[in-house]
Regions:
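N-terminal cap/leader regions of alpha/beta-hydrolase-fold enzymes
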Residues: 1-183
């Protein structure tokens, strides 16, 4: 595996992005892997590595770069703990348009890297970023061939850019969750 942490130009500055892909056999399809609210941490890097080990060029951007935050550390369950409050403040500082502008920079970076096949793009978002994965697929249907929202939040809102309004297709379910089995 080839791993690097690079600064990628975005509209509002540079986002520190963890990039990982196989050493050989490229160019590799691109996956934009959007973080969850607790920010970049080793668990997410490990998940990116696992995706890359299946033949993908994975980009894990720091969405909190505007605030100068890279990692938050452990988030205690206490809702009044300062670390949890900071996490929610950072999470609420983002919106679909901001993250889509970041994605433009990420896709431009991938286009310039011979290890990446930017004609085949997928995206995955966890929790707060599920909406970003769905929105990126809706905004770039010719380029983003698959999107996954894993326990995504804010997928259906009253906002005009709500992912449920812009998605071409949506599927939900779980083999083991009785709630989604019934749906």
């Amino acid at each position: 595996m080839i791993e690097s942490q690079v600064e990628i130009a975005a509209r509002d500055g540079a986002t520190t992005t963890f990039v990982v892909h196989p050493e050989r056999g490229g160019p590799h399809p691109v996956i934009l892997f959007f973080m969850d609210a607790p920010a970049i941490r080793e668990e997410l890097r490990d998940m990116a590595r696992r995706l890359a080990s299946s033949g993908y060029y994975v980009m894990l951007p720091n969405l909190y770069y505007r605030a100068g935050v890279m990692e938050l550390g452990p988030i205690p369950p206490d809702p009044d703990h300062p670390a949890r409050k900071q996490m929610f403040q950072l999470m609420n500082s983002l919106d679909i348009d901001l993250v889509m502008s970041d994605a433009e920079g990420l896709l431009a970076f991938a286009s310039a890297d011979p290890a990446a096949d930017d004609s085949r793009v997928g995206t995955v978002g966890y929790c707060m970023s599920g909406r970003y994965a769905a929105s990126l697929a809706a905004r770039h249907p010719e380029r983003v061939l698959a999107a996954a929202s894993i326990y995504g939040t804010h997928l259906v809102t009253e906002a005009p850019d709500s992912p449920h309004r812009t998605a071409r297709e949506g599927r939900a379910g779980s083999r083991t969750d009785p709630v989604t089995e019934a749906a």
